[in-house]
Structures are given as structure tokens and as C-alpha cells.
């Protein structure tokens, strides 16, 4: 009997023990986008810093750990060519935890090059400052090729501008508060620290915000997310900079919960293609984190990328042809025999971030982040007063200014044209100062001027941001089928915009007066003052010394708050989500100096009078025009909503439909008529309304991948503001357009197929779109010196221009057909397109990877249907009607037409290898060759000048030549790295 009881007790103990170890963890490891399974990944099970078990994923990406006691575990997932990840899992009540999917992102060969290099164009005053909008790829078959491979051509995803792509850092929205642009340059050179990121494409939502219609990217940047270990690399890129040195270290999360990381780099030297362009940039990241327990984690990190960089300028084709080089750069010249660039960007914008993460259970997690951005961003440019234009490619220095074969241009001085052409085409030191900036002459002019008052100077246009941000979000798994995500973010931005005297170029001082105003109001000394208060107090214009502010000085004040939520329901392969945002945007201008032209009222509310003349002025609606003090506050209610449906079938098939509507506030820089000079807002400012949808099919199985997407986006009520010299008015003017509408529709196709040789795959992508303007916006043109409205009408040929029926051609001149009433017969309309991106792009790529870590890649690309950026002046009745105001078919077809760039074909290749030493050290290299056919005639962008040439008979206008940017010829990037 006693033996029987002992056996029974032992049996019950064994059963109890077995029931305590019935728990487990299972999941499938998949590529983050496309959900392709990752076979052969190493999964490690860790508890309290001790490695318990390991598993290798099956061909379908699955793994399983069985017989686990209740408790909290860490799962670490690593795979070749992927960025590893670690997640926390709790096993309780003896149940098998099914995590469904563990997602990891692929490491690209090209990740060692800075995406920001393609985003910083230094073209703010040319109207061409959009960055590529797909540099952060999500690694499906389409974006894997397009995301990096199309960077050289400055491809815009679906034709969208940079500001439509939402970029987050540690969960904080980082798009620029003033312009909305993506802020790539803020972390340029910190590849390792910023490598860990989550991205969505198009209308997909994320864990950090609802986002817009051009994807969301969140860069983790916390120290525990930086790749563990040491890494050193040296890189040379012939198209960007001569040398990049980089080092990084990350401890990972230690047993005591602490984590440390740093990343530093230097980018130095010029490149093989553009003279005067150089880098002298440095970058430093440092971070520390502490996990106090399984619920609480705190991370603190800071980084900055101080440096300077010489910039390139666009020029006309005439100049490029005279120099025999499409890479000619008019920004530089020789000073004492050394190259000096007049356009140099200086940056130092440190960022400090504190992030708190709270994970009380597997079903709920949340974070809160505080981020501060400070420092300065500026670029230099030549300034001059009472002197000749010092730019070498100024139109009066070119042969075409003196002579053109067409007599109607009234340029008939052949002798001067011949001399100018000779001076431009000689390649001897004697003519270098004609083809480039003559720095020595500028110094001599200043030195010999009375009192050494500088006629020439080097200004620095500064943008100093003080940007305080807060963001918080949560993720709650309410039931196994329903997840709720939500959060809030807020921003307080104070940005000072001003000019700084960078270099007096040998002079003693520079007068702080408005040279454009002096030409029109020379008899009234007060009106020409940039700082009227100084003039009234001292009786003369301020003498500006080096390092002093001058010209303009104002604050852009932005306040922003946003709430968002996203509900996701999943069942049996079907997923539905509904997301929305609600926010408030407010901004105003605060002038810090009083400009003579727009004196406003004094501190007592009275008009300002000088020597019997009233300086206070009023706009066309009777409102006082002020330059100093606070402007009217613009406040907008913003909101958006998204709906997403997806169905995943067995065998790797996935169908999805996304739709969204967005009501966004206009940006600060497109809301003021002339923020440099006055507080006047654009009339009838409205929110931008966008309706967008896409339909997707994806297939991933057995190494085969396919993605097909059709998309549509309609954008309404955009605003654009620009300033330019109007020849018809002989004055500097401001041009404000409202009601700009666009339509983007297109097709994306990506396919990857494994070939007959193991490790060899073929990939092909197609991007076809039609990105067109769909409205003729309203425009108001004002004189910059007086705010006088000189034109308020629609821009009749903005969205398209007519093509007229030709009756005959006589001596090479078209004779247009007319109807019975004498009206010219229109045969059709030619659409006008979104600029500076190919609307047809294709690529074919072969990739070969060996088991001993060699890789080879060869790709061919074709781009077409890219268009020049238009200016509105050429699409007005004024420009098309000429001096006599009569529009003829030939004038309209000539003046309103939009230039289409020639197609381009490129061939690229890369090779690389890595070696492992004692399973501890890795050394490797990658060599990439771009544009191997050395095609030097590929236009990547440009813009129309806003100048007009009056004909000999004063009855019509001709255009100034447009200015272009070209892609560099054959170039290489060599990267050598060592890590352990």
C-alpha cells in the first residue's frame, strides 16, 4: 500500500511538472515589407542574459520553442543580409505564444552611402529644392531597386515632392517646420547610428503616426538599436567627396540593462566632376540607454553634423557649350591662385533626444519622446551695391547678349559677340577670370573705393531654428484580432531668418541700404534703409562690419499639435484598418527690424513721418503694411483619414487597397508674399486638400517576388510664392499663386526571379506615371518696393496650352487657319507636367551572391518623360501677348510650351566581398560603378528664368534661356570596412 502511494505521488508530481512546461513560443521570420519568409535565420532564446536555446528558421521562415516554463524571455533574430532584431516575449499559463510574424529589414549594399547626399541640392533660390522621396526603401521587390538605384536621376516617388514624405526620429515628426521638406541633412554621415528604421510606402500607416500619402519612415536612433560591436570604414566617392572616414561602436543591451553607442565620421575633399564643390563635414553621435526592468526603459542621445560644403550652380546651355562641359560651375573663381567658392553652406544643428518606453505587458506598450533641435544653417552668396554683377555667367557677359541670328531679338553686334565667345572658349590663365569669379578684382574695387567702403561683399543667409518637440504613442492589443494604436505630437518652432556679413572682401564696411529701393526712391533717403530705426536715431545708414546682421531679420513662429489613432482588425488572413488625425497649425511672422519701405506705425500707433514725408504705407485693401512686429496669426484645422483593406492567401499572395483624404495647412514659406520685407500674407490662404488611393497585388514564394500597384492622387488648393525681376515692369516683383491643383496617377511593377544558377536572380521594375497640373491658378503680382498690386488674374496657360491648326508654311513661317469669324482654330491642348522627375522609369538588374560572400550586380536603367520646372510669368497673357498686347498662335505656342528632357539610358554595376576571421572579425569591401557608359548629357532638373526679351518691333517677347543641372559622368564608390 505504501509503495502504491509513493508511485501515485511520483506520477502526480511528474504530471504537475509536465503541465508547468507546456508553454512555448512560435512565429515566422519574414521580410518587413512583402512578408517574404526568411529561411536560415538564427533565433536565440535568452532569459536574464543567459542563452537557453537556438533554432534555425525553416524554408517557410517558421521556428518553435516548446516546453518552456512561464516567464519573460528575449528573442534575438539574426540573418545574413538582414538587420537583426530583439523582442521581449512573456510565456504564461502554460500556453504556446504565437507571435505570428517577426519582421526584419534587409541590409542593402548601398547603405554605406548617405541618402542625404542626394537630398542636399543647395538650390533654394532657384525654385528647385525638392529631395528624392524614396531614398528610405522598404525593401520589397520594387523599392529595393528604385529606393537607391534611381537616386542619381533624382527620382521622385510617384512624382511627389519631398514635403509629402513623413520622416520621424525616435517617434518624433522631423519634417522641416518652415518648408515641410524631409530633413536628411540633419543626420548626414551617421549611417550606423541611423540604420535601424521602419518604413512604409504610399498610404500605409505606421506605429508612429498615420502619415500621408507618400510613406512614413521612423529612424530608431536609440543606442540599443545601433548594431552591436565595432565598425570602421573608409569610403571614396568620385561624384561626391574624396574621402569618408567612419567609426562606430555599440555595446548592445548589457546584462545590467545599460547600453552605449557612438558614431563618428568625416567627409572631406572634392570630386572628379564639378570644380569648386567640396565637403568638409563632420558628424558625431553619442547615446546611452538604461532598461530598469521589463517595463521601463530610458534612452538619451545627441548628435550633430557640423561642417561646410561648396555648392554647384545651374547655368544655361549656352554657357555649358562655351565651356565644353555640362559640369561647369559658375560659383567659383581663383583668389591668389587658389579655388574659392562663393556658395558655401555652413551647418551646425545639434539635436538632443530623450525617449521613455513603457511595456507593462505583451499586449500594451507606449513611448514618450522629447526632442530639441538648435544651431544654425546658412549659405553664402555674393552681394553688391553700386557695382557690376560679378557672376561670370551673367547674361550680359555672354555672346548671345550681343548677337543673335534672329533679327527680331535686336542683338546685332557681331564683333562684341565674337570677342565674348573667344574669351569664353580660351583655356589659358589669361581668360580664367572671364570664365570664373574674379575674386582679385572684387578685392581691388573695394580697396580703392573711398573709405574702403565695400561695393562687393559675401553675405551669409542664415536660418537659425529653435525647435522643441514632444511625441507620445501607444500600441494596445485589445483582443487577438483587434489592435488600437494612437498618439499625439506637438511642436514649438522659433526660426530666425537674417543675413550675416560673412566677408567684406578687403573693405572696411558695407552700407545697410536696399539697392533696389535706392534706384526707385533715391530722393527719399529714409525709404532705402534696411534698418529705419537706426537711421532715425543716428542720421545715417548703418555701416555693417564683418559678423553683423543686415538686410533683413525676422522670426518665423510655428505652433503645431496633432492627435492620431489607428484601429486594426485581423482575422484569417483578412486585415482592415481605419486611421485618422486631428490637428491645429498656427504660424506668424515677427519682424525684428523696421524697413524704410514698410515703416508701419510707431509705438503709439501713429504714422511715421520723416522730413515732412509720410513713410507709413497701405496695401490695396487699406491695411497698414508693416515690416517690424507681429503679423496676423494664421490658424488652420488639419485632419486626415485612411482606410486600408488587405487579404493574404496561402501560397504567398496578398491583395490590398488603401485610400486616404488629407486636409493640410500651407507651409510658412508659401504663405507670406515677401517674408524678407514685410508681414503681408497671401490673400485667401487655404488648406491643401488631397485624395489618394492605391491598389496592390504582391506575391512572395520560393524566391519569386512580384508587386503590382496602381495609384491615383488628386491635390487641390496649393500655394506658391516667388520673387523675381520683371522686365515688363522694370522692377523686382513678388508673385503669389493660389489654387494650384495637380493629378498624379500611375502604375508600379516589380518582379524578381531566381535563375538557373544558385544565387543568381533577375529583377525588373517599371514606374509609369502621369503627373499633371489640372487648374489655372489665380495669381497676384506686387511690386516688391511698394507692395503695389500690378496684376491680379488667372494664369491662363498653366495647366496646358493650345496647339493651333496650321493652314500653310510659307518660307518656313507657319500660317494658322481661322474660322469664319476670324478666330484661330485650336486643334488640341498640350498638358503641362510636374517637373524634375522622370514619369517613365524602368530598370533591369542581375544579382549574383555566392556562399562565400561574394556579390555581383549589373543593372540597366531607362528614364523618360521628365520636364523642366515652369515659371508662371511665361503662361500669362502679358508674356504671350507681347508689347502690343495681341496674342498670336505662334507667341502662345512658343511662350507657354514646357520643355521635355531627352530620354536617358544608364548602366551601373557593383562587386563586393566579405571575409570572416575566426568567426569574430569581418573585413569586406564594395565597389560600385555608376553611369558606366559615361553619359554626360542627362538633365536631372533645372528651371526657367523669369526674364523677358523685347522684340525689335516691341510687339512680342522672347524668353531667356533656361538653366539646367546635369548628372555627372562615370563615377565610382569604393567602401572598405572592418567590424567585430
Describe the role of every protein-language-model region.
Residues 132-173:
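Extracytoplasmic beta-strand/coil segments of soluble accessory domains associated
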Residues 465-467, 477-485, 489-500, 505-506, ...:
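Structural signature of Gram-negative outer-membrane beta-barrels, strongest in the C-terminal barrel
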Residues 24, 236-269, 273-312, 344-363, ...:
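Transmembrane beta-barrel wall of Gram-negative outer-membrane proteins
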Residues 297-355, 378-459, 523-547, 721-724:
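Acidic/polar loop-and-plug regions of large Gram-negative outer-membrane beta-barrel proteins
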Residues 715-717, 862-884, 913-980:
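C-terminal beta-signal and adjacent terminal beta-strands/loops
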Residues 570, 711-714, 735-873, 977:
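Gram-negative outer-membrane beta-barrel transporters
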Residues 134-135, 141-145, 172-203, 220-222, ...:
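Short acidic/polar hinge/loop motifs at secondary-structure boundaries
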Amino acid at each position: 500500500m505504501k509503495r502504491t502511494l509513493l508511485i501515485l505521488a511520483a506520477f502526480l508530481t511528474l504530471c504537475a511538472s509536465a503541465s508547468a512546461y507546456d508553454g512555448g513560443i512560435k512565429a515566422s521570420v519574414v521580410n518587413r515589407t512583402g512578408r517574404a519568409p526568411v529561411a536560415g535565420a538564427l533565433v536565440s532564446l535568452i532569459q536574464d542574459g543567459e542563452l537557453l536555446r537556438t533554432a534555425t528558421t525553416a524554408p517557410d521562415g517558421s521556428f518553435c520553442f516548446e516546453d518552456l516554463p512561464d516567464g519573460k524571455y528575449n528573442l534575438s533574430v539574426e540573418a545574413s543580409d538582414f538587420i537583426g532584431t530583439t523582442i521581449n516575449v512573456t510565456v504564461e499559463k502554460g500556453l504556446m505564444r504565437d507571435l505570428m510574424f517577426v519582421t526584419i529589414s534587409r541590409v542593402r549594399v548601398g547603405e554605406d552611402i548617405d541618402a542625404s547626399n542626394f537630398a542636399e541640392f543647395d538650390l533654394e533660390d532657384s525654385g528647385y529644392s525638392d529631395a528624392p522621396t524614396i531614398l528610405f526603401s522598404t525593401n520589397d521587390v520594387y523599392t529595393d531597386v528604385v529606393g537607391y538605384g534611381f537616386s542619381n536621376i533624382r527620382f521622385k516617388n510617384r512624382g511627389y515632392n519631398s514635403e509629402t514624405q513623413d520622416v520621424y526620429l525616435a517617434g518624433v515628426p522631423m519634417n522641416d517646420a518652415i518648408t515641410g521638406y524631409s530633413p536628411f541633412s540633419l543626420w548626414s554621415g551617421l549611417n550606423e547610428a541611423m540604420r535601424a528604421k521602419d518604413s512604409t510606402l504610399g498610404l500605409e500607416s505606421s506605429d508612429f503616426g498615420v502619415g500621408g500619402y507618400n510613406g512614413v519612415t521612423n529612424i530608431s536612433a536609440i543606442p540599443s538599436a545601433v548594431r552591436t560591436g565595432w565598425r570602421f570604414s573608409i569610403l571614396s566617392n568620385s561624384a561626391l567627396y574624396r574621402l569618408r572616414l567612419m567609426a562606430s561602436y555599440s555595446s548592445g543591451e548589457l546584462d545590467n540593462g545599460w547600453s552605449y553607442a557612438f558614431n563618428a565620421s568625416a567627409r572631406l575633399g572634392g570630386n572628379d566632376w564639378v570644380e569648386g564643390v567640396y565637403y568638409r563635414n563632420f558628424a558625431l553621435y553619442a547615446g546611452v540607454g538604461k532598461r530598469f526592468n521589463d517595463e521601463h526603459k530610458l534612452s538619451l542621445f545627441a548628435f550633430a553634423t557640423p561642417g561646410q560644403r561648396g555648392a554647384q550652380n545651374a547655368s544655361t546651355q549656352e554657357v555649358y557649350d562655351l565651356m565644353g562641359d555640362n559640369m561647369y560651375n559658375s560659383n567659383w573663381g581663383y583668389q591668389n591662385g587658389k579655388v574659392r567658392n562663393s556658395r558655401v553652406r555652413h551647418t551646425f544643428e545639434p539635436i538632443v533626444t530623450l525617449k521613455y518606453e513603457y511595456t507593462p505587458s505583451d499586449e500594451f506598450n507606449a513611448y514618450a519622446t522629447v526632442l530639441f533641435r538648435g544651431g544654425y544653417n546658412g549659405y553664402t552668396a555674393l552681394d553688391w551695391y553700386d557695382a557690376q554683377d560679378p557672376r561670370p555667367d551673367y547674361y550680359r557677359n555672354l555672346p548671345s547678349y550681343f548677337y543673335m541670328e534672329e533679327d527680331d531679338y535686336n542683338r546685332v553686334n557681331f564683333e562684341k559677340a565674337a570677342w565674348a565667345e573667344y574669351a569664353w572658349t580660351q583655356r589659358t590663365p589669361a581668360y580664367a577670370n572671364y570664365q570664373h569669379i574674379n575674386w582679385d578684382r572684387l578685392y581691388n574695387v573695394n580697396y580703392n573705393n573711398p573709405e574702403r567702403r565695400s561695393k562687393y561683399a559675401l553675405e551669409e543667409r542664415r536660418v537659425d531654428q529653435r525647435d522643441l518637440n514632444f511625441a507620445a504613442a501607444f500600441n494596445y492589443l485589445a483582443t487577438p484580432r483587434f489592435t488600437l494604436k494612437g498618439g499625439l505630437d506637438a511642436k514649438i518652432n522659433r526660426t530666425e531668418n537674417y543675413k550675416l556679413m560673412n566677408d567684406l572682401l578687403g573693405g572696411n564696411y558695407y552700407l545697410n541700404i536696399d539697392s533696389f529701393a535706392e534706384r526707385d526712391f533715391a530722393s527719399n533717403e529714409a525709404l532705402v534703409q534696411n534698418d529705419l530705426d537706426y537711421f532715425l536715431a543716428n542720421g545715417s545708414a548703418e555701416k555693417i562690419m564683418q559678423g553683423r546682421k543686415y538686410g533683413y531679420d525676422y522670426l518665423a513662429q510655428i505652433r503645431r499639435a496633432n492627435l492620431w489613432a489607428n484601429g486594426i482588425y485581423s482575422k484569417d488572413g483578412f486585415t482592415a484598418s481605419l486611421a485618422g488625425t486631428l490637428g491645429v497649425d498656427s504660424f506668424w511672422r515677427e519682424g525684428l527690424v523696421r524697413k524704410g519701405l514698410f515703416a508701419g506705425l510707431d509705438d503709439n500707433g501713429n504714422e511715421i513721418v520723416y522730413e515732412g514725408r509720410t513713410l507709413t504705407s497701405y496695401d490695396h485693401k487699406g491695411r497698414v503694411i508693416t515690416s517690424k512686429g507681429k503679423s496676423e496669426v494664421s490658424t488652420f484645422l488639419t485632419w486626415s483619414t485612411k482606410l486600408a483593406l488587405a487579404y493574404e492567401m496561402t501560397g504567398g499572395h496578398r491583395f490590398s487597397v488603401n485610400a486616404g483624404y488629407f486636409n493640410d495647412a500651407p507651409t510658412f514659406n508659401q504663405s507670406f508674399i515677401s517674408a524678407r520685407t514685410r508681414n503681408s500674407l497671401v490673400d485667401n490662404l487655404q488648406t491643401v486638400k488631397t485624395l489618394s488611393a492605391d491598389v496592390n497585388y504582391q506575391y512572395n514564394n520560393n524566391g519569386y517576388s512580384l508587386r503590382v500597384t496602381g495609384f491615383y492622387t488628386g491635390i487641390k488648393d496649393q500655394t506658391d510664392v516667388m520673387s523675381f525681376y520683371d522686365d515688363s515692369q522694370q522692377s523686382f516683383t513678388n508673385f503669389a499663386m493660389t489654387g494650384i491643383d495637380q493629378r498624379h496617377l500611375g502604375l508600379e511593377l516589380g518582379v524578381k526571379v531566381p535563375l538557373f544558377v544558385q544565387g543568381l536572380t533577375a529583377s525588373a521594375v517599371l514606374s509609369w506615371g502621369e503627373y499633371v497640373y489640372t487648374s489655372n491658378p489665380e495669381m497676384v503680382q506686387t511690386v516688391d518696393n511698394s507692395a503695389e498690386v500690378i496684376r491680379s488674374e488667372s494664369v491662363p496657360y498653366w495647366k496646358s496650352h493650345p496647339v493651333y491648326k496650321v493652314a500653310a508654311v510659307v518660307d518656313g513661317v507657319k500660317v494658322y487657319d481661322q474660322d469664319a469669324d476670324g478666330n484661330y482654330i485650336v486643334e488640341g491642348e498640350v498638358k503641362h507636367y510636374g517637373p524634375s522627375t522622370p514619369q517613365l522609369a524602368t530598370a533591369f538588374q542581375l544579382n549574383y551572391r555566392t556562399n562565400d560572400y561574394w556579390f555581383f550586380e549589373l543593372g540597366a536603367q531607362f528614364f523618360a518623360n521628365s520636364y523642366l520646372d515652369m515659371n508662371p510669368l511665361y503662361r500669362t497673357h502679358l508674356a504671350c501677348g507681347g508689347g502690343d498686347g495681341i496674342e498670336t498662335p505662334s507667341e502662345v505656342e512658343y511662350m507657354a510650351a514646357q520643355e521635355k528632357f531627352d530620354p536617358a539610358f544608364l548602366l551601373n554595376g557593383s562587386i563586393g566581398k566579405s571575409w570572416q576571421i575566426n568567426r569574430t572579425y569581418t573585413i569586406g569591401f564594395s565597389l560600385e560603378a555608376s553611369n558606366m557608359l559615361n553619359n554626360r548629357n542627362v538633365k536631372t532638373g533645372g528651371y526657367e528664368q523669369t526674364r523677358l526679351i523685347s522684340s525689335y518691333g516691341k510687339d512680342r517677347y522672347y524668353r531667356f534661356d533656361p538653366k539646367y543641372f546635369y548628372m555627372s559622368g562615370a563615377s565610382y564608390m569604393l567602401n572598405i570596412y572592418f567590424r567585430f
